[in-house]
From Swiss-Prot:
Protein name in UniProt: UNC93-like protein
Superkingdom classification of source: Eukaryota
Positions annotated as glycosylated: 45, 210
Gene Ontology CC: membrane; plasma membrane; striated muscle dense body
InterPro entries the record matches: Ion_channel_UNC-93, MFS_trans_sf, UNC-93_regulatory
Keywords of the record: Glycoprotein, Membrane, Transmembrane, Transmembrane helix
The organism of origin for this protein: Drosophila melanogaster (Fruit fly)
Length: 538
């Protein structure tokens, strides 16, 4: 262009950057431009993912709640559930981050949901060599599915908060609350299906057996129940095969419907900044480096302190789904009443999930978690001494419903707390959540066939106590850090005002606001996504 050639560089070739290289600065990354009306589309997507999970778990929860009773021989049902959560632990460590990076959040959800179908189908041919491998497949697909769900809710929650100018933590908890409202309502539909089918068929006559159940049999129900000594109990017989077939076909249809809902109606997360959580350096990491993200997250003190309560969440769900249904409901009332009692759990759980998600912004997180702890401490203590009797069925429904209150607290508040504390590493953080929750399931199912119910209740009490202690420490550290950050913001703002004392009032105010941006970012502060979302206010 200038007519001048430098011979000294004649044979030199510029070094080209690697394909896909992008400067690691927020200012050069592509911005996500959204208008305020996008909030309605976000709410639509939240509804879609919630409905899909509701339909999916209508099938799985309904099936899982029956396992310890309809497949009680040799503990097959409980072993298959244990296989699910053991595989889920392994899957949480190795799969979610890799699969989400490869398939994106939406298609990870689709593929993972399909993994549930074989387990439902093999209920027609229950053997150790069919149900256990099918359970392992469910576990391998579950971790990426739950991590994808949590990532989607958290990321669109951040975008929604920026569009509506609301607090991020309140929005995230509200979205999780709505999700768990739909998800826990699956207990209602799944158990309603199983109860109606079992009550309308030949096994519906089983209700007669529970009216004439002997006092001798009742002595071994409740806290005295031991799986190894339950043989010959009339209320624990497997329902007829035609009823199992009908239930399984209905549940299989639910799995297919859930997959189609996600595939055809959910917007990809890239619309809201997927893969913009930082630079593209994450995409350049090797597979081993991506796998190590989950392990690195475990080194964080906050996560370590939350491990006991996360393990308890898995254990308490395993107890209500396997031990309570078998030792209390099936033992005293009959298998055909399991669904009806668990409907109460599902309805209360769903209503409390949305309630707690909404009131959290008014009363804070701590009072809600205190409520959950008190409810579960009380229920576990009562169940140690309560002797179930079919003449008082209302007590079964009350215990089930109150357990739903406690579970709703943990599901909404602890999920939301993970999303708040570890925003910059959402996939790895929620993989850890699912890992330790799954560990709780595995622990509970591992001793399900060897320990009596009384000992299981004592173990629940011990783990809940440790979990509450860990949560209290996390809450204290978080509030202390927030106070420190606010103090730092005030000091920096004051310094800016002092430097700009000679400037106009508007300039001084702008300088003060700029000073607040100098706070060091940590896990429970701003996500890089905040810089990439531009809201056009037209």
């Amino acid at each position: 262009m200038t007519g001048f050639t430098n011979a000294g560089f004649e044979n030199d070739e510029p070094v080209k950057p690697k394909a896909g290289f992008e400067p690691d600065t927020a200012s050069l990354r592509e911005k996500v431009v959204l208008n305020p009306g996008e909030k309605w589309r976000i709410l639509k997507n939240i509804s879609i993912i919630s409905i899909a999970f509701m339909v999916q778990f209508t099938a799985f929860q309904g099936t899982a709640n029956l396992q310890s009773s309809i497949n009680a021989k040799d503990g097959l049902g409980t072993v298959s559930l244990s296989a699910i959560y053991a595989a889920l632990v392994v899957s949480c460590i190795f799969l979610p981050t890799l699969i989400i990076r490869k398939l994106t959040v939406k298609w990870t959800l689709v593929c993972s949901m399909l993994c549930y179908a074989p387990y439902i189908a093999f209920q027609l041919f229950p053997r150790f060599y069919t149900l256990v491998p099918a359970g392992i497949l469910v576990g391998m697909g579950a971790a990426p599915m739950w991590a994808s769900k949590a990532t989607y809710l958290t990321q669109v929650g951040q975008v929604y908060a920026k569009i509506t100018e609301q607090a991020v933590d309140a929005i995230i908890v509200r979205f999780f609350g709505f999700f768990f409202l739909a998800w826990q309502s699956a207990e209602l539909w799944g158990n309603l299906i199983s109860s109606l089918v079992l009550s309308s068929g030949a096994h519906g006559g089983g209700s007669s057996s529970n009216t004439t159940v002997s006092e001798e049999d009742l002595q071994f129900c409740g806290a005295n129940f031991c799986t190894t000594g339950s043989g010959g109990h009339g209320n624990l017989e497997r329902p007829p095969e035609d009823e199992i077939f009908e239930i399984s076909m209905i549940y299989l249809s639910c799995i297919v419907a859930a997959v189609c809902i996600i595939a055809f109606f959910l917007d990809p997360l890239k619309r809201y900044g997927e893969k913009r959580k930082g630079s593209n350096s994450a995409a350049e990491l090797s597979g081993l480096q991506l796998l190590s993200a989950t392990f690195r997250q475990m080194k964080k003190p906050n996560l370590q302190l939350l491990i006991p309560i996360t393990v308890f969440i898995g254990m308490e769900q395993a107890f209500i789904g396997a031990d309570f249904t078998q030792a209390y409901v099936a033992c005293a009332l009959g298998v055909n009443k399991i669904g009806f009692v668990m409907i109460c759990f599902g309805v209360v759980n769903a209503l409390c999930s949305i309630l707690f998600g909404s009131v959290m912004k008014y009363i804070g997180r701590t009072p809600i978690i205190v409520l959950g702890a008190v409810v579960h401490f009380t229920l576990i203590t009562v169940e140690l001494f309560w002797r179930p009797n079919p003449d008082n069925p209302i007590i079964f429904y009350a215990m089930s419903g109150l357990w739903g209150v406690g579970d709703a607290v943990w599901q909404t508040q602890i999920n939301g707390l993970y999303g708040l504390l570890f925003r910059r590493n959402k996939e790895a953080a929620f993989s850890n959540y699912r890992l330790w929750e799954s560990a709780g399931f595995v622990i509970a199912y591992a001793y399900a066939t060897t320990l009596c119910t009384q000992m299981k209740l004592y173990i629940l009490l011990a783990v809940l106590t440790l979990g509450c202690i860990g949560y209290v420490i996390v809450e204290i550290l978080y509030r202390k850090k927030q106070r420190k950050l606010k103090k730092q913001e005030k000091l920096e703002a004051a310094e800016k005002e002092k430097e700009a004392a000679a400037a106009a009032a508007a300039a001084a105010l702008a300088a003060a606001e700029a000073g607040a941006d100098g706070v060091e970012e940590t896990d429970d502060e701003l996500d890089d996504l905040e810089e990439d979302i531009v809201v056009t206010r037209l």
